[in-house]
Amino acid sequence: MRVILLVLAALVFPAAAQEDMSAKTWLNNMSQALRDKEFKASLIQLQAGHVRPLVYLHGIVNGQEIAFLEYLNGPPKNAVRVGNTVTFIEHDQAPYSVVAGRLQGIWPAAFAGDIGALETSYQFILGGRSRIAGRPGQMIRLLPYDNSRYGYQVWLDMETYLPLRFDMLTEDRQLLEQLMVIELLELQEPPALLLEAYKHEWPPVIDQAERQEGQNWQFAWLPKGFSVLIRDHHRLIGSHEAVEYIGLSDGMASISVYVARAGSSPLPEELLTRNGLSLVTEKVGNAEVVALGKVPMETLSRIAKSLTLE
């Protein structure tokens, strides 16, 4: 009887301790788990009326984070991260590598980073608990302080602190996008696939195109918490004209801004919002600006109009 009571106490104590944890503590534990744990997650992504199954592997090999993301439907498409290098492998083009700290297309990069940096833009609120993928989960809401971005909610596994479900919501709580784990396996060692990825000779990181003199575009306004992450040149599909590309993020939402000489490139003309992904076009002086991102259309329009050339 004494042994049984000790076992029950060992099971109850962690859950009791979790009752006193703040929403930020839960998120900090998630951040550490995403960086440090060895695991395999099978997921489904609901986006724009489509269901997309994914498999995500994560592990540590010789002190380096290794991750692998596979899209299970459609043409083969994978992404591999070794340290801060991400390589994209697609069926219709040669593999290529870029510098990136996390894999895109799954959880927000901020989830594995400094959670405190999100506090300037989002309020963390502890929600209820529910069962997801056969595991008890604690829900945390991330509510924006203004209407320039959407809100989010995430359910964390109460044992591993890994995310089990992630929702993007409008101000009136309409679901725009969802990522849900259907099976989560915590591993004791890196799977063979990640060991091979660590040893493999991936393509070198591609060089950014040289920036043209005078193309110093600046923003007179950005929503609080957003900053410029990258600047380079892109070539639009079907066009030989280079356009200026500026990538913005607040850690949760990402925005892409494209700038071209008016009439030089076939930029989209319509305004649209579809399942959280918005697109706007604006004319700024002699330039055409396209802004694309999972934020309200009004935010994109204001960002595009605030561009100035210095």
Question: Predicted regions span which residues?
Answer:
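Positively charged n-region of N-terminal signal peptides that target proteins for export
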Residues: 1-4
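N-terminal signal peptide c-region/cleavage motif recognized by signal peptidases
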Residues: 12-14
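N-terminal mature ectodomain segment of secretory-pathway/periplasmic proteins
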Residues: 18-94, 122-130, 136-139, 143-151, ...
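Short, surface-exposed coil-to-beta transition loops
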Residues: 51-55, 148-152, 164, 176-178, ...
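Acidic/charged, solvent-exposed loop-and-adjacent secondary-structure segments enriched in E/D, K/R, S/T
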Residues: 88-110
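Gly/Pro-enriched, hydrophobic low-complexity segments
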Residues: 133-200
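Short, well-ordered beta-strand elements
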Residues: 166, 286-294
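Short, solvent-exposed recognition patches
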Residues: 200-285, 298
